[in-house]
């Protein structure tokens, strides 16, 4: 490994020294043959002899060209011949170069300013820091005696501290009694001791913090004064101090002096860079500061020296820790740039790029351009035409479509080959000519800059052209993946990055390279030109919705792999998150209120990157199958594993079953006991019994089951001692997969002579907590015993006896008897070893979060985390939770787990081989309080707050605090809405701390993720996206080209102009309202985790704000059930509900005579196109179309209703199932309540002919379980009285309303699926019917109770059974007379799911249902998804004069209204006059296709939004209002916190008048009215109060604003004023300074005070509106109240587009 290079002089000649570490030893290699040189371009080669005669003097020595040779090079891509001039010594070059340049025959000289040692590295292709050598590091720090006014190094050094891997020590020359302090006699002896320490320890790296400018210089000066030779170099030299700009830099020969200060200044943005501040920012831990005066006092008095020594020791220790943190990144940068770490760590970003390009130029035989002289620099900095700005016509505009180019300028650089070496190049066959400026760029070869940035992206466009030309769909797909992969070559991530994926529903943490490589081995990837693409299914990634910022699970469509050679960027965030990406791969950064894609090449320290606040993982009750785990082990590992089952009830079972199976397959005669086995097979679902026969339901499954019993019958053995059957696992290894779970549950599994356990473990809170204990402080061991066999042990450690008690209890619960030691619990069971090893790993370095934990219910995940924390966590003194582990996989697993629990406030650190995860949030099982003001990614950074609100903030702020301030009016709500996604979404921001660049050659990888095209990846989890960003130089760079920059901008203008011209000529948009649904429409929501069916009007609880005639109510914690584009039912956030009165037509859409939906004429429903309109292979989203009520029957014939279970699923308690079946029977055919004594204790049930069956299946099990006391037959045959006091009370309380009618309580909507199904089973068994109508199976529930029927429908939807409802038109009759009721039928649509999940208790109904469905199959394609279809029967206009409502559903913009999927608009649609909404959308998409087909290369236009109305001052100063009524302003002064209420209110009214009402004159009238009222003192003083905050100590204010003046007067009265105090004041009329006239508002007395009307008009109201109205030609004086009438500007202000 090369550490550094330099040169020395021997006999007047340079000798290159290469300092290396090789095989653990330091060595110096010498090269005496390398010569200094530069290049000269001559007018005539004959002049070379004259040039060789040129001389100059250097320190009395004559300097001249030693020799010259002619060489062929390229200059800006053009062939050129230059002379390479060699010299004797490197110092000859600066001495003679100007004289050579001035010779008339010399055109110019080149590469004369590259230092000799750096030139050597470039020319020889040597890369510093390359290799795997382990470097020894030593950090040191000094403490000095300083009194104010003393000269530098006048005072002595008091202490020298140093730290390395062995620890930290302090050397001093006063007695300090501490174990890490070495005391010597004098300062001189102390310095000598330190020099001896360095010599003995012989570190490769010396780490300092500002050692360049303090420590080394101070030591050197004191050493000189004391007569000590300050030898630190490995060559026996003293440190070399040299000037570097306005700072110094210190070299120690043979060692790398790594000064952290310039590195940290370049990497991290901090308000102060003290060692203490940096340490806390990096590691999240405070460090004590001892000030110079305190050190001096302690030294001179002898008191407190221990504190100083401890501080000195900690300085060295902290410097060492920081060095270890930053050194690897600087080493990677050194490898990439190809220069020494000493140089790289002290270089600016611009210099690093220069050195990188210089090396690349040498590799390509390119002559590097010279740096610009002052004249050239001035030329480069001259202005040129900027980007396109269309000066808008004054006035107000309607219907604004916003179109934008993605990455416009980088795309132009690559598309048009813009580069200095292609500029105006003669002799090319093809040029791209920049419009307007006329610069030509050769297209015959790739330019130097574009080729470094985007060679592969050019290839992508060729493939797109091939795609358009080919008609072969396979080739087209392959080419499509190829062009994606080519894009990804510059936009991919490296193989070692972590990636969480859901594979077949189970979350796995994988390295992306390993996962893609292994998956591709099993599949058949498509390959073209080295790009491999494998289409996959069953794999999902964690991503986020770009619009809503909500985390989503999205399918991975393909895995992509390609070889790559180029730059990679190592991006480290302040939380410790980290990812390596290729140059063009994007992360998501905060820019101007939004998240945008920013590439690795563009990301800089201080950027804020998107990381997850929460990830929404699927939840289910997990169950571990031990058999599956055992099957994953080799046979030798399971040779002693057996399965056992009790004999009771199974005598001769295995042989009897085998004989029966052979008989079924007609190989033997019918056994006498066949009925017994047939009944068992029927329970397993293999056969169906009839009165005199049976029917095979699944022949293939039965055949496999027989294979199992062939082995079982032969291999099973009888163990008489334990009265059990036993079979060796290995005997069943190949067939056990055929054993049904119902049978497997009855077996136990374990070792032959040891412990056995049930084969399934339910992952509940107890087991999860035990796993957490193990992962934190447990290990699993397998070792040889004395009998040469194997012993297995699992030990979990803890020193807290209460914790050990809990561990023992939990371990005993699952594994029987355990052993308790002093500080551990031991489970000596092989099955425990197998289980823990497979789920969690064994050693500290390979531990992991078990996969089953991630997808378990939230309470289970918390239980695991609690166990882990108790075992391996601690509560840091700063109140933060700290978790420690050596396992990188476990760290990432913990982060994903914490994110799934909604915790994002984490930091990850790595120290001494241990990862530490710090959590700064309150946890439910702890009483910790989060630490305030610490920067964690869950808070909103103050930089974001400042950008959003346009004012300074002292600290970061939590979303809750921000909301509180907005609600109080302290922060502007309109501005806050810009970052609403940051407050409410699943994204938080993490600051980029460091970006390191290096070279990489090998495979890079990417995923294609459906819809979102982003995924979670990297160490600590970041959101990554594939995109591209181009790089261009800066004005001082060698390769900068003013003509190139000018051309890129000109092309940008041209493309924007063309686009605008095209859209003006071909398209024109108008706006129409798109309204909502009626107030009594029921929507399905989940509020705070609970499912509700609520009338939409009930969601509207208050008016939070108004936009025009529309009223809005903000919602929190509310989600709506919706359907995504993949046909899945999902829950999505509802941020608000809107209502308004309408005069539009309201239509009632009837689906049956009892099921309808009321919508406005413009509201869209979601229709489903059948395969006659859209081919079946088309994506589902192309078949889901928006349709207006009057278009039903023409455009589409079917609408969508829900058809998938949304209730949670559990492992149900069998007795609880029976109880809910009974309750269902009671609601159907029961009676309860009343005032009799019987009613207090009994409920009645009419069973009819099914009494015996109901008793056997329901009543008897409930009696035996003690749920009911008893049951008795009544006088009427078939009736039963059930004795149960609690049940009688329960039924009265919950299942009858105040009128005594049966009902279903709302809590049932949140029961587990299994219990709802049990209730429905009982209900349908009582009141349901099964029939065949015209050959079609029919299942109905009949009632006369409409409310009950509606509630039953909701329960059916909850368990995934689609249904409808209709009412009989003929009234019911009783004894020949009309009863006044009509039968209401709930009709089952998805009959097969009903049969499978609900069915009937009664055999007669169950059999009839089975028979009816046997020949009836589900043919609906919709059943592949989570929905069913319904067909409107009738549409009619109705009278309706109340509010109509709409809800905003994030992501999908759809919700279920009365069970029908409808589209929620944001209030408005864009349209073309005379065309419907579908036409508008179609035309908009057609325009994008049209223009993008015309645009060359990578250029692509995107549809960014539609605005209802807006006005423009310049390109970057405008205000618009979108369809949601959201007002966006840019570049215009908007309300500030220090404005009074009158200013805020006036501005809001002005914007509303202009943007919502389209009336500028109204806006002007509003301002005049306010100024008039102010002038006449008619404005209430409450609206004039100004609130400003004191942000620092009063003594620190240099300027005294009104609030400071008031504060100082209050302080003078003894009122305490501290930073954070808000001063509320009002300005009074009078003369003098405003501060003198400002008084606290509570002292304002209207009887004796008058406010300063002129102040409020000029400094509050007019500034709030002036910039807005200036866009319409108004001046300040036009807006004030005037007694004489002013001529209006109405004609001029007429809204464009209005007739």
Swiss-Prot record:
General function of this protein: In addition to polymerase activity, this DNA polymerase exhibits 3' to 5' exonuclease activity.
Chain ranges of the DOD-type homing endonuclease domain: 770-903, 1222-1361
Enzyme Commission code(s) on record: 2.7.7.7, 3.1.-.-
Record's keyword terms, sorted: Autocatalytic cleavage, DNA replication, DNA-binding, DNA-directed DNA polymerase, Endonuclease, Exonuclease, Hydrolase, Intron homing, Multifunctional enzyme, Nuclease, Nucleotidyltransferase, Protein splicing, Repeat, Transferase
Family membership noted in the UniProt record: Belongs to the DNA polymerase type-B family.
CDD domains tied to this protein: DNA_polB_Kod1_like_exo (cd05780), Hint (cd00081)
InterPro entries for this protein: DNA-dir_DNA_pol_B, DNA-dir_DNA_pol_B_exonuc, DNA-dir_DNA_pol_B_multi_dom, DNA/RNA_pol_sf, DNA_pol_B_thumb, DNA_pol_palm_dom_sf, DNA_pol_type-B, Hint_dom_C
NCBIfam families (UniProt xref): intein_Cterm (TIGR01443), intein_Nterm (TIGR01445), pol2 (TIGR00592)
PTM note: This protein undergoes a protein self splicing that involves a post-translational excision of the intervening region (intein) followed by peptide ligation.
Official protein name in the record: DNA polymerase
Catalyses which reaction(s): DNA(n) + a 2'-deoxyribonucleoside 5'-triphosphate = DNA(n+1) + diphosphate
Keyword Cell membrane tagged: no
Gene field: pol
GO biological process assignments: DNA-templated DNA replication; intein-mediated protein splicing; intron homing
GO molecular function: DNA binding; DNA-directed DNA polymerase activity; endonuclease activity; exonuclease activity; nucleotide binding
Native source organism of the sequence: Thermococcus sp. (strain GE8)
């Amino acid at each position: 490994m090369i550490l550094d290079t330099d040169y020395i002089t021997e006999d007047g000649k340079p000798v290159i020294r290469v300092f290396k570490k090789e095989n653990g030893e330091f060595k110096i290699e010498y090269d005496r043959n390398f010569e200094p040189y530069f290049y000269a371009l001559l007018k005539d080669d004959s002049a070379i002899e004259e040039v060789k005669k040129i001389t100059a003097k250097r320190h009395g020595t004559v300097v001249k060209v030693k020799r010259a040779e002619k060489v062929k090079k390229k200059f800006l891509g053009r062939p050129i011949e230059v002379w390479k001039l060699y010299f004797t010594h490197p110092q000859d070059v600066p001495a003679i170069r100007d004289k050579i340049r001035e010779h008339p025959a010399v055109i110019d000289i080149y590469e004369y300013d590259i230092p000799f040692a750096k030139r050597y590295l470039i020319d020889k292709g040597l890369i510093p820091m390359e290799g795997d050598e382990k470097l020894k590091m030593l950090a040191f720090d000094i403490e000095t005696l300083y009194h104010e006014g003393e000269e530098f190094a006048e005072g002595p050094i008091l202490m020298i501290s140093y730290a390395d891997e062995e620890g930290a020590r302090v050397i001093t020359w006063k007695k300090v009694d501490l174990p890490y302090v070495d005391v010597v006699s004098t300062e001189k002896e102390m310095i000598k001791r330190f020099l001896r320490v360095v010599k003995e320890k012989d570190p490769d790296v010396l780490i300092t913090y500002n050692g360049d400018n303090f420590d080394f210089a101070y030591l050197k000066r004191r050493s000189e004064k004391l007569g000590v030779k300050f030898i630190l170099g490995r060559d026996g030299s003293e440190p070399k101090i040299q000037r570097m700009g306005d700072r110094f830099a210190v070299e120690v020969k043979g060692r790398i002096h790594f000064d952290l200060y310039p590195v940290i200044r370049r990497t991290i943005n901090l308000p102060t860079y003290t060692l203490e501040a940096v340490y806390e920012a990096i590691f999240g831990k405070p460090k004590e500061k001892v000030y110079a005066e305190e050190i001096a006092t302690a030294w001179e008095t002898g008191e407190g020296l221990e504190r100083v020594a401890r501080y000195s020791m900690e300085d060295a220790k902290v410097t060492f820790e920081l060095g270890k943190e930053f050194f690897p990144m600087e080493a990677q940068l050194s490898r990439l740039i190809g220069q020494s770490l000493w140089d790289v760590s002290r270089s600016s970003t611009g210099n690093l790029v220069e050195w990188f390009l210089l090396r690349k130029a040498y590799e390509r035989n390119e002559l590097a351009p010279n740096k610009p002289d002052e004249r050239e620099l001035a030329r480069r900095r001259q202005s040129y035409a900027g980007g396109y700005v269309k000066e808008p016509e004054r006035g107000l505009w309607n219907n604004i479509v916003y179109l934008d180019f993605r990455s416009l300028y980088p795309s132009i650089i690559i598309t048009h080959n813009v580069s200095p070496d292609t500029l105006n190049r003669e002799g090319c066959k093809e040029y791209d000519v920049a419009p307007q400026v006329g610069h030509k760029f050769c297209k015959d070869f790739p330019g130097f800059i574009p080729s470094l940035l985007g060679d592969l992206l050019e290839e992508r466009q060729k493939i797109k052209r091939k795609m358009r030309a080919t008609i072969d769909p396979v080739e087209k797909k392959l080419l499509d993946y190829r062009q994606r992969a080519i894009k990804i070559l510059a936009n991919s991530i490296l193989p070692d990055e972590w990636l969480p994926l859901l594979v077949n529903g189970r979350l796995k943490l994988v390295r992306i390279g390993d996962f893609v490589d292994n998956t591709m081995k099993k599949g058949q990837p498509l390959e073209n030109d080295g790009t491999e693409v494998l289409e996959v299914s069953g794999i999902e990634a964690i991503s986020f919705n770009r619009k809503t910022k909500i985390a989503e699970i999205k399918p991975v469509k393909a895995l992509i792999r390609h070889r790559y050679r180029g730059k990679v960027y190592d991006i480290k965030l302040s939380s410790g998150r980290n990812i390596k990406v290729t140059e063009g791969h994007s992360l998501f950064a905060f820019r101007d209120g939004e998240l945008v894609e920013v590439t690795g090449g563009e990301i800089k320290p201080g950027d804020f990157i998107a990381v997850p606040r929460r990830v929404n993982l699927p939840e289910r009750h997990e169950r571990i199958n031990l058999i599956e785990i055992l099957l994953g082990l080799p046979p030798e590992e399971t040779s002693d594993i057996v399965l056992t089952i009790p004999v009771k009830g199974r005598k001769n079972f295995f042989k009897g079953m085998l004989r029966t199976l052979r008989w079924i397959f007609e190989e033997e005669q019918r056994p006498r006991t066949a009925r017994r086995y047939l009944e068992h097979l029927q329970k397993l679902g293999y056969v169906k019994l009839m009165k005199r026969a049976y029917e095979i339901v699944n022949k293939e499954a039965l055949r496999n089951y027989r294979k199992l019993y062939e082995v079982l019958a032969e291999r099973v053995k009888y163990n008489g001692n334990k009265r059990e059957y036993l079979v060796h696992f290995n005997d069943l290894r190949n067939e056990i997969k055929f054993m049904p779970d119902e049978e497997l549950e009855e077996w136990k599994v374990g070792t032959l002579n040891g412990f056995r356990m049930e084969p399934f473990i339910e992952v509940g809170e107890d087991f999860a907590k035990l796993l957490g204990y193990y992962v934190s402080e447990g290990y699993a061991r397998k070792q040889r015993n004395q009998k040469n066999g194997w012993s297995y042990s699992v030990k979990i450690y803890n020193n807290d006896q209460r914790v050990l008690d809990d561990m023992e209890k939990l371990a005993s619960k699952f594994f029987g008897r355990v052993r308790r030691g002093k500080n551990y619990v031991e489970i000596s069971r092989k099955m425990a070893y197998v289980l823990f090893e497979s789920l969690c790993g064994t050693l500290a370095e390979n531990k992991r979060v078990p996969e089953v934990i991630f997808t378990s219910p939230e309470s289970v995940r918390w239980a695991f985390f609690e166990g882990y924390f108790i075992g391996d966590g601690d509560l840091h003194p700063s109140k933060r939770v700290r978790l420690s582990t050596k396992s990188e996989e476990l760290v990432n697993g913990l982060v994903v787990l914490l994110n799934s629990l909604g915790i994002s406030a984490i930091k990850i650190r790595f120290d001494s081989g241990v990862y530490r995860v710090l959590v700064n949030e309150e946890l439910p099982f702890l009483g910790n309080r989060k630490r305030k003001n610490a920067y964690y990614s869950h808070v909103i950074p103050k930089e974001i707050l400042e950008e959003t609100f346009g004012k300074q903030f002292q600290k970061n702020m939590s979303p809750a605090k921000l909301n509180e301030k907005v609600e109080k009016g302290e922060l502007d709500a309109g501005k806050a809405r810009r970052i609403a996604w940051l407050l409410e979404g699943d994204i938080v921001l993490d600051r980029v701390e460091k970006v390191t660049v290096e070279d990489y050659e090998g495979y890079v990888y990417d995923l294609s993720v459906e819809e979102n095209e982003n995924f979670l990846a990297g160490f600590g989890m970041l959101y990554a996206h594939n995109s591209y960003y181009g790089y261009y130089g800066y004005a001082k760079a060698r390769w900068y080209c003013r003509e190139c920059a000018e051309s890129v901008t000109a092309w940008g203008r041209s493309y924007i102009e063309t686009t605008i011209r095209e859209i003006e000529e071909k398209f024109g948009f108008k706006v129409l309202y798109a309204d909502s649904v009626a107030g009594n429409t029921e929507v399905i929501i989940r509020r705070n985790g609970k499912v509700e069916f609520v009338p939409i009007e009930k969601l509207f609880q208050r008016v939070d704000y108004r936009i025009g005639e529309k009223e809005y109510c903000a919602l929190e914690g509310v989600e709506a059930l919706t359907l995504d584009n993949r046909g899945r039912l999902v829950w999505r956030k509802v941020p608000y509900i809107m209502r308004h009165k309408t005069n539009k037509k309201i239509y009632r859409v009837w689906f049956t005579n009892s099921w309808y939906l009321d919508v406005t004429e413009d509201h869209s429903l979601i229709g489903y196109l059948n395969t006659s309109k859209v081919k079946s292979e088309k994506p589902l989203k192309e078949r889901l179309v928006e349709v207006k009520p009057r278009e039903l029957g023409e455009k589409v014939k079917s609408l969508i209703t829900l058809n998938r279970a949304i209730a949670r699923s559990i492992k149900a308690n069998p007795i609880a199932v029976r109880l809910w079946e009974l309750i269902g029977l009671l609601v159907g055919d029961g009676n309860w309540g009343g005032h009799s004594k019987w009613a207090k204790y009994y409920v009645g049930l009419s069973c009819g002919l099914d009494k015996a069956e109901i008793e056997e299946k329901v009543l008897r099990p409930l009696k035996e379980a003690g749920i009911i006391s008893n049951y008795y037959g009544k006088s009427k045959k078939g009736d039963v009285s059930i004795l149960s006091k609690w049940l009688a009370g329960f039924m009265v309380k919950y299942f009858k309303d105040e009128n005594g009618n049966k009902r279903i309580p709302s809590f049932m909507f949140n029961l587990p699926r299994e219990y709802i199904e049990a209730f429905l089973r009982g209900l349908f068994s009582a009141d349901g019917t099964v029939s065949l109508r015209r050959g079609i199976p029919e299942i109905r529930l009949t009632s006369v109770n409409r409310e009950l029927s509606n509630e039953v429908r909701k329960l059916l939807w909850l368990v995934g059974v689609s249904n409808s409802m209709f009412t009989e038109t003929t009234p019911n009759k009783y004894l020949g007379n009309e009863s006044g009721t009509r039968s209401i039928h709930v009709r089952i649509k998805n009959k097969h799911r009903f049969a499978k999940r609900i069915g009937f208790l009664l055999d007669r109904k169950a059999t009839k249902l089975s028979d009816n469905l046997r020949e009836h199959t589900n043919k609906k394609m919709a059943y592949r998804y989570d929905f069913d279809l319904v067909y409107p029967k009738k549409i009619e206009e109705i009278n309706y004069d109340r509010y109509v409502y709409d809800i905003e559903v994030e992501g999908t913009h759809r919700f279920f209204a009365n069970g029908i999927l409808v589209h929620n608009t944001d209030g408005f649609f864009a349209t073309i006059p005379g065309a419907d909404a579908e036409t508008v959308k179609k035309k908009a998409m057609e325009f994008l296709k049209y223009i993008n087909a015309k645009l060359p290369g990578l250029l692509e236009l995107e549809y960014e939004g539609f605005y209802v109305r807006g006005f423009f001052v310049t390109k970057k100063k405008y205000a618009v209002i979108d369809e949601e009524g959201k007002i966006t302003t840019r570049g215009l002064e908007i309300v500030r916190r220090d404005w009074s209420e009158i200013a805020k209110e006036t501005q809001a009214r002005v914007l509303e008048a202009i943007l919502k009402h389209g009336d500028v004159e109204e806006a002007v009238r509003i301002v005049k009215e306010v100024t008039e009222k102010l002038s006449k003192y008619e404005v209430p003083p409450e609206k004039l109060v100004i609130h400003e905050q004191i942000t620092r100590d009063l003594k620190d204010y240099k300027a005294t604003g009104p609030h400071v003046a008031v504060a100082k007067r209050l302080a003078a009265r003894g009122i305490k004023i501290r930073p954070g105090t808000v001063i509320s004041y009002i300005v009074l009329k009078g003369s003098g300074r405003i501060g003198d006239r400002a008084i606290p508002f509570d002292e304002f007395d209207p009887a004796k005070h008058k406010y300063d009307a002129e102040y409020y008009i000029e400094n509050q109201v007019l500034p709030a509106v002036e910039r807005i109205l200036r866009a319409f030609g108004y001046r300040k004086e036009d807006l004030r109240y005037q007694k004489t009438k002013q001529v209006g500007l109405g004609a001029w202000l007429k809204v464009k587009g209005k007739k």
